[in-house]
Amino acid sequence: MACGGGLYSFIGSRLAVAGLEAFLLGAALNSSMTRPPNRSGGEVPRTFGVEEEFLLVDATTGQPVPAAEACLAKAPQRPETSGGPSLALEVQQEQLEAVGPVCSTLQEVIAGIREGRRLADEAARSVGARAVAVATSPMPATPTLVAQPRFLNMATRFGVTLREQLTCGFHVHVGVNDGEEGVAVLDRIRRWLPVLLALSANSPFWQGADTGYASFRYQAWSRWPTAGPCERFGSEREYHRYVQSLLTTGVLLDEGMVYFDARLSRNHPTVEVRIADVCMEASHAAAIAALVRGLVERAAREWRSGISEPRLSAGQLRLAAWKASQSGVDDTLLHPLLNIPCPAGEAVQVLLSHIRPALADSGDEEQVTAEAARILSAGTGARRQRETMMSTQSLAAVVLEAVGHTHGVEHHGPAQAVPAPASYLTDIPRSRS
C-alpha cells in the first residue's frame, strides 16, 4: 500500500507532538507506578483464562461435519471443580468450544490451551472427525444449527446472518477488582485491540474462496448489530445504561448478544476481550492472552493514576479494526497512537512498549516478545493457510495441515527482532510502499 508524502506533511507537527506526549506520559508512568493490588489483595499478576472455538471437520476430506452434540455425548464428563478445561456447544453443530481454567501464569494458560485442544480432538475423533483451530472454514459449508430454544429464536429473528455464521473466535478473560475498574480498562484498551486482531488473523477463506482478508471472520461477525468497537463509557453506570438502552430497542434477544470487541463479563469479575480469531498454534494463542492481560494491567494502572483515556471515536477504531482484518501482519496497520498507516511490525512494537512493565512484572516479557517476533516473521494462521493453498492447490490440504498445527506441529521459524518504532518527531517517514 502506498501512502503519499502529503499525508505525513499534512499531519505534521500536530500528530508528532501528540505522539511524543503519549510516549513521554507512558515513560513517566512506567518509571513511577507500582502494580495495584489484585482481587486477593496482593501484588501478584491478574488471573486470566481463555475460550477457544474449533471447527469439527472430516478427518479425511477436511469438510465441516455437524457432530458437536455427538462429540459431547461421547466425551468424558469433567466436574466443574476439576480445575481443567471443559467442552461446550456453540451455535452450530460444526463447532466445539473449549473453556479453559482460571490461571495465574502464562505457563498455566498454554497448558490449559493444549489440554483443551486435546479434549476437543479426542471428542471429535470419537465420531471420525477432528477439531481444527481455523476461524472460518476453507471448504464450502452449510452450517447446521444446534436446536436449542435460544439459537432457534436467533435464527428466526436474524435469518441468514445466523444461518451463515460459522466462525471461531478466541476470547480472553482477565480479572478486575470491580466493574468501575473494568470499564476504565475497556475505555483504555480500545485503541490496541486491532493489533491483537492482526496478530491472531486466521481466516482468509470463506465458502471455498480466498476473501482477500486475513481475518474474514471479523468481517462476517461484524454483521451482528452490536459487534465491533464502542465509544468510551467513562463509568460503570454509563456502561450499564448503554447496554440497557440496546436491550430496550427489542433488537437483541438478551444481554448475551452484546457482542462488543471487549466487554464486561456478565458472569465473572472479568473484562472479556473478544476481537481475536482462534489461533492455529497454541503458542500464538497463549501470547495473545498474555498481551491482553498486559493491556488490562497497564490500563488499570493508568486509571488509578488519574490518566485520562484516549479520545478516539468508535468510527476511527472501526477503520483500524477493518484494516487489521484485511492485512493481518502482512501489510500496514493503523498506528495505535497516531492513527496513520505504519508497518505491522511498528504497530506491534508500540504495543509491546506500552505494556512492557506489566509483562515484566508477570514474568511474560521474554516469551511474549519472542512469540510476537515469530508471528511477524513466520506469519499468522492466515499466511500459513494461503501458503499451503499455493503449494498444494487443495483446500482439503489447507484444513488437514491446520489440524496438525492445532495439535502440536508448531512452526517456529527463526525469531527476528521486532522492529523499533520510528521517532515520533524526527523519523516519521515521508512515504511508504
Regions found by a protein language model. Name each.
Residues L20-S32:
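Short, Lys/Arg-enriched N-terminal segments with co-localized hydrophobic residues
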Residues P45, V134, P138-P140, P149, ...:
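Metal-dependent DNA replication initiation modules
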Residues L29-V127, P143, M154, W221-S433:
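C-terminal accessory/tail domains of diverse enzymes
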Residues L145-A147:
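Surface-exposed, active-site-proximal loop segments in enzymatic domains
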Residues A16-V17:
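Short polybasic linear motifs
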Residues Y8-F10, F23:
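Aromatic (phenylalanine/tyrosine) cluster motif
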